[in-house]
Amino acid sequence: MVKVGIVGGTGYTGVELLRLLAKHPQACVTAVTSRKDAGIRVDEMFPSLRGRIDLAFTTPDEARLAECDVVFFATPNGIAMQDAAALLDAGVRVIDLAADFRIKDVFEWEKWYGMQHASPHLVADAVYGLPEVNREAIRSARLVANPGCYPTAVQLGFLPLIEAGVIDTASLIADCKSGVSGAGRKGEIGALLAEAGDSFKAYGVAGHRHLPEIRQGLARASGKPVGLTFVPHLTPMIRGIHATLYARLTKDVDLQRLFESRYADESFVDVLPAGSHPETRSVRGANLCRIAVHRPQGGDTVVVLSVIDNLVKGAAGQAVQNLNLMFGLPENEGLDVVPLLP
């Protein structure tokens, strides 16, 4: 049984980790931390976990995290980089759901995240936790940088095309929409129902923090830098990301066969039949990316539609998928969840 600690268990990704791990047959949550809510029972804050998680939140100092086999950081950016080194020195493996270890260029990370990196020496050792790309490296990793939500949907959509060398990588476009839970569980004017409901807007057009992460992953697949325009949007839904991706074909190729072949052995990527249009509700609550590929009017533009639940395949579910790989467990352990409908 893998002993699990969660740092920052009161946010949406934290409670999603608790939901998934509560039914995991080979993992046991032994500590959940929150400085602000220390002493409060988990099932008091989250009644959905009554009868599933018999723990109270504790401070990180009281949590005895060094006795865990693995610790998840479901914290804001900048926390894991301060605390991960001590846990790693104690032999604990770490999965960071924030962005502290995702970008290999530390100076680039500091520019986008507006703070000095506290553990730059760990960045090179961190494995980027996208299993569909780095499965073997994740198995032996001590420190995993769990991908962001937009980067997961965008990379899984573009990768078959880039790996096959059939598109112009100088002018990629990612037009993405997210539900409000992507902003986290905090009080902000823009996330209020009266502000976000019945409305739809783009944001971060001049530059979003996920842009360098996406470019890094696509450049690695391409073997050279890529040109990417990434525009995120906020939609009046709670969960879900819909990425509409555009690229120019440079070779004639059977796109459906290309995508089906690339993901044939991937349990958590579902390539839909030709002509399909995936819906965000079809992946709600599940660790699943659904993809459809189109070539409108048989032209030289390829359009890829990629949908995920931002809290599951875009965060906590992918983190549990990484845990399974790190501890030699079946990759779908605890993740065989049917999406919620309606």
From Swiss-Prot:
Pfam hit, one: Semialdhyde_dhC_1
Sorted alphabetically, which InterPro entries does this protein's record hold?
AGPR_AS (IPR023013), AGPR_type-1 (IPR000706), NAD(P)-bd_dom_sf (IPR036291), NAGSA_dehydrogenase (IPR050085), Semialdehyde_DH_NAD-bd (IPR000534)
**Superkingdom of this entry's organism?**
Bacteria
CDD domains for the chain: AGPR_1_C, AGPR_1_N
PROSITE patterns recorded = ARGC
GO cellular component terms, alphabetically, are:
cytoplasm
Question: Which keywords does UniProt give here?
Answer: Amino-acid biosynthesis, Arginine biosynthesis, Cytoplasm, NADP, Oxidoreductase
Keyword Oxidoreductase present in the record's keywords: the answer is yes
Task: Give this protein's Gene Ontology molecular function annotations.
Answer: N-acetyl-gamma-glutamyl-phosphate reductase activity; NAD binding; NADP+ binding
Q: Where is the active site?
A: 149
UniProt record similarity statement:
Belongs to the NAGSA dehydrogenase family. Type 1 subfamily.
Mind telling me which PANTHER family this protein's record contains? Answer: N-ACETYL-GAMMA-GLUTAMYL-PHOSPHATE REDUCTASE, CHLOROPLASTIC-RELATED, N-ACETYL-GAMMA-GLUTAMYL-PHOSPHATE REDUCTASE, CHLOROPLASTIC-RELATED-RELATED
Protein name, entry field: N-acetyl-gamma-glutamyl-phosphate reductase
User: Its gene?
Assistant: argC
